[in-house]
From Swiss-Prot:
Residues given in the record as UDP binding sites: 11-16, 106-107, 227-233
Swiss-Prot/TrEMBL cofactor(s): Mn(2+)
UniProt comment concerning the protein's domains: Has 2 domains, the N-terminal GT8 domain that binds UDP and Mn(2+) and a C-terminal domain that assumes a Rossmann-like fold. The GT8 domain has UDP-galactose hydrolysis activity but no galactose transferase activity. The C-terminal domain probably binds the partially glycosylated protein acceptor in a continuous, surface-exposed groove that can possibly bind proteins with varying degrees of glycosylation.
Keyword Metal-binding on entry: yes
Outcome of mutating R90A: Loss of UDP-galactose hydrolysis
Protein name, UniProt field: Glycosyltransferase GlyE
Keyword flag Manganese: yes
Note: Encoded in RD10, a pathogenicity island with an atypical GC content that is associated with invasive pneumococcal disease. Pathogenicity islands account for greater than half the genomic diversity observed between isolates. The main function of this island seems to be correct synthesis and export of pneumococcal serine-rich repeat protein PsrP.
Record GO terms (molecular function): glycosyltransferase activity; metal ion binding; nucleotide binding
Keywords from the named record: Glycosyltransferase, Manganese, Metal-binding, Nucleotide-binding, Transferase
GT8 domain: region residues: 3-265
């Protein structure tokens, strides 16, 4: 029985969720014990909550990596119309991934078999392993499948080198971040066999340039990874490339089919179902909610509701990476009231101007309220709070919140 999880990274936005999930299903159909990191900016928590259960039952996990904030800006130009800005997200892999080695996969691909040999490939001192672009008809390597030496990327600040090179060259390159990756790593990578990134999506290009040798490559058995590059995607209403049906097979496959296959092989683990023991709420008019990241990490069994009457700053939106934090931007007093009614505890943790609605609802519905010493309201007496705790010792707040659990 495998004890360690293999690290995999996908990146994409909510508009691409069907493609992301299809690629994930194909990967999980043939590989278990996967720790999948999904770099994104806008995929809802509910999707993560359900898919995470499936991964956990196969001995893996799913990590929601929110690229929200100025440090994750990806507003570089890209000359390929079928590729959006999220392709640059792979630059930030060392920010989120803790494993020394990680497999990055584009979302427009299908895995057809066991990738153990790929996961176990020794990278040595190379920065990554990748397959040649378009079977040698392209330039350099294709960046859709990368086995990354994450330890080396982290120690040598590769993220910043990629950003600096992109700032300098993005208007001059033809293939976006793929060109940048080729420029930076040049000959400092290992070559993968074509079967690990079989670019079936190049069919249209191969036919255009009369590359008959590509159509002579056997497709039985199927290559281990089919990559539907180019604009000729199999999920379009019409496409002309081969193996469109393989993509649809996995897209329409139910997760139960995948799970039952692993269960039949005695790969079955309990999922960590999210059962909250306490509901807490805060109304904020500020981006700064004291120690909320720390509290969310320390108290996974507590559901934190963060409400604002306006748009929220990135610092608050990024909290959605925690499965136990729900944010409500642009809410209204009557909606806040319903959340307070359903909550067990009011956390007066926001800085700057306080909004009286919160205190009125706390009083009306007799909800207990606690605060840090640097966030309690100047307009309320200490007896309005059931506890005020030092912000310099947040573990005391953790203990206080735990004391209210059912």
């Amino acid at each position: 029985m495998r004890n360690t999880k293999r690290a995999v990274v996908f990146a994409g936005d909510y508009a691409y969720i069907r493609q992301i999930e299809t690629a994930m299903k194909s990967l999980c159909r043939h590989n278990s014990h996967l720790k999948i990191y999904l770099l994104n900016q806008d995929i809802p928590q509910e999707w993560f909550s359900q898919i995470r259960i499936y991964l956990q039952e196969m001995g893996g996990d799913l990590i929601d990596c929110k690229l929200i904030g100025s440090q994750f800006q990806m507003n570089w130009s890209n000359k390929l119309p079928h590729i959006n800005h999220m392709t640059f997200a792979r630059y930030f892999i060392p920010d989120f991934v803790t494993e020394d080695k990680v497999l990055y996969l584009d979302s427009d691909l299908i895995v057809t078999g066991d990738l153990t040999d790929l996961f176990e490939l020794d990278l040595g001192e190379n920065y990554l392993a990748a397959a040649r672009s378009c079977f040698g008809a392209g330039v350099g390597f294709n960046a859709g499948v990368l086995l990354i030496n994450n330890k080396k990327w982290g120690s040598e600040t590769i993220r910043q080198k990629l950003i600096d090179l992109t700032e300098k060259e993005h208007e001059n390159v033809e293939e976006g971040d793929q060109s940048i990756l080729n420029m930076l790593f040049k000959d400092q990578y290992s070559s993968l066999e074509d079967q690990y990134n079989f670019q079936i999506g190049y069919d249209y290009g191969a036919a255009t340039f009369k590359h008959q040798f590509i159509f002579d490559i056997p497709l039985e058995p199927l290559p281990l990874i089919l990559h539907y590059i180019s604009q000729d995607k199999p999920w379009n209403q019409f496409s002309v490339g081969r193996l469109r049906e393989v993509w649809w097979e996995y897209s329409l496959m139910d997760w139960s089919v995948i799970l039952n296959e692993w269960f039949s092989k005695s790969v079955k683990y309990p999922s960590k179902s999210q059962i909250f023991k306490l509901q807490c709420v805060n109304l904020t008019n500020s981006w700064c909610v004291e120690k909320i990241d720390y509290l969310a990490e320390q108290l996974p069994e507590v559901h934190f509701h963060i409400v604002a009457y306006t748009n929220m700053a990135n610092e608050l939106l990024a909290l959605t990476r925690f499965p136990n934090v729900t944010v409500y931007p642009n809410s209204l007093p009557m909606l806040l009231e319903q959340i307070v009614i359903a909550s067990d505890l009011y956390l007066d943790l926001n800085h700057d101007r306080k909004l009286e609605d919160a205190y009125e609802f706390v009083l009306k519905y007799k909800k207990p309220m606690i605060a840090f010493d640097n966030t309690c309201s100047e307009n309320l007496s200490e007896i309005s709070y059931e506890g005020i705790y030092p912000s310099s010792i947040p573990k005391k707040m953790v203990a206080a919140i735990r004391s209210y659990m059912r």
